């Protein structure tokens, strides 16, 4: 990875962290993380995986769940981006990312806060699906203009 790619990854991580931390409804059973729009970027270009994984890890430090949210978020990202090597369709990748987020985040919310598992799985999964589909649409339309190859 060259310095330019490292710099772009650092900027993506920083933007993800900023969008997550300033969002008052970015954590919990009912959440809407606008920053998840960015999580589809590695589905278009895998060289941005490190930046997104780093961004998720740093952003989740600020979660009320603390370290467990860091582990869960990074795990979701690593699994989803690994699966994306075998799944080439960006929409299916956005879907699998959202399902993983719903299932794993709900488990953390259940174990740490005692929140109902299936309610959390559905609400987190749906909100993530909405934002990742928005991201997929945006980056499919204009990604080539705003993301360097």
Could you tell me what each predicted segment is?
Residues 1-43, 47-50:
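Hydrophobic transmembrane alpha-helices
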Residues 16-21, 52-59, 105-108:
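Membrane-embedded alpha-helical segments in integral membrane proteins
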Residues 24-29, 61-149:
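Membrane-embedded alpha-helical hairpins and interfacial helices in multi-pass inner-membrane proteins
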Residues 36-39, 52-57, 137:
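Re-entrant/interfacial helical elements at transmembrane boundaries that shape
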Residues 43-45, 57-63:
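Interfacial segments of multi-pass membrane proteins
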């Amino acid at each position: 990875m060259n310095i330019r790619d490292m710099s772009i990854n650092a900027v993506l991580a920083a933007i993800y962290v900023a969008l997550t931390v300033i969002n008052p409804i970015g954590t919990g059973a009912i959440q809407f993380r606008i920053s998840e729009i960015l999580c589809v970027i590695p589905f278009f270009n895998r060289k941005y995986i490190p930046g997104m994984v780093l961004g998720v890890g740093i952003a989740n430090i600020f979660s009320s769940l603390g370290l467990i949210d860091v582990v869960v978020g990074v795990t979701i990202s690593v699994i989803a981006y690994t699966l994306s090597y075998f799944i080439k369709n960006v929409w299916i990748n956005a879907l699998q990312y959202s399902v993983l987020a719903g299932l794993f985040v709900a488990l953390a919310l259940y174990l740490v806060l005692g929140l109902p598992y299936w309610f959390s799985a559905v609400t987190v999964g749906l909100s993530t699906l909405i934002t990742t589909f928005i991201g997929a649409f945006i980056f499919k339309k204009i990604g080539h203009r705003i993301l360097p190859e």
